[in-house]
């Protein structure tokens, strides 16, 4: 059990009752204390058999660090797991999680740049990615929509709840300029875990190579096999 009696340092044995930094064999409970735990360092791995974050408590995992849990994560109402940019939650077994976490991902982009995104949490709307971007510039790729007489795929505007494992492409915020700047997306929801199946689709064209009209490189019958997939897990 975390007590935070010394500091916010997860890796300090004196912050735990009984004294000792948790291993993969230890159930980890984070109650509401004056010092919320922070996982920090240079690619440090925090460990636990399972993880419970109680009401009022926040566990923060700093950039480039991981928390590795053998089984499940339970975030009580009013508690929070905060994964900063390039931090990861890694789970060994296919247990279901409960509760809401926050996960940041930062990209460097301009207004007219497009970035590929995939959701690490359940029930996250595609229009919640970069809410400062006009709705008409959020797309998914559909291989079976024809862009020419030969039936190759196409981008399709969307505002759907993000399908786990599917990739989406979103333009930079309307307020951005042509100068590169950071944009941080915050994903909020139940962290994904376990086996996630993503159906693959393709077009039906089976003819000769053809011109797409946008490149001198000819497309082939295999070019409608492309699917845009994304990492559905809260890992860097």
Locate predicted features:
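N-terminal exported-region signature
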Residues: 4-236
């Amino acid at each position: 059990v975390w007590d935070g009696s010394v500091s916010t340092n997860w890796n300090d044995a004196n912050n735990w009752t009984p004294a000792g930094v948790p291993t993969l064999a230890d159930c980890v409970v984070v109650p509401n204390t004056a010092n919320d735990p922070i996982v920090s360092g240079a690619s440090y791995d925090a460990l636990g058999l399972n993880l419970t974050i109680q009401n009022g408590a926040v566990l923060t995992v700093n950039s480039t660090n991981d928390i590795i849990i053998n089984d499940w994560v339970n975030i009580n109402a009013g508690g929070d797991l905060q994964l900063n940019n390039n931090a990861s939650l890694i789970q060994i077994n296919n247990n279901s999680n409960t509760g809401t976490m926050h996960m940041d991902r930062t990209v460097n982009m301009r207004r007219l740049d497009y970035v590929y995104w995939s959701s690490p949490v359940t029930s996250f709307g595609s229009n919640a990615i970069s809410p400062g971007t006009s709705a008409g510039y959020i797309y998914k790729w559909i291989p079976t929509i024809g862009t020419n007489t030969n039936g190759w795929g196409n981008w399709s505007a969307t505002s759907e709840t993000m399908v786990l494992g599917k990739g989406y492409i979103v333009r930079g915020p309307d307020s951005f300029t042509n100068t590169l700047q950071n944009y941080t997306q915050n994903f909020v929801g139940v962290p994904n875990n376990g086996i996630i199946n993503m159906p693959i689709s393709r077009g039906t064209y089976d003819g000769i190579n053809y011109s797409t009209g946008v490149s001198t490189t000819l497309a082939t019958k295999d070019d409608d096999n492309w699917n845009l997939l994304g990492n559905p897990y809260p890992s860097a």
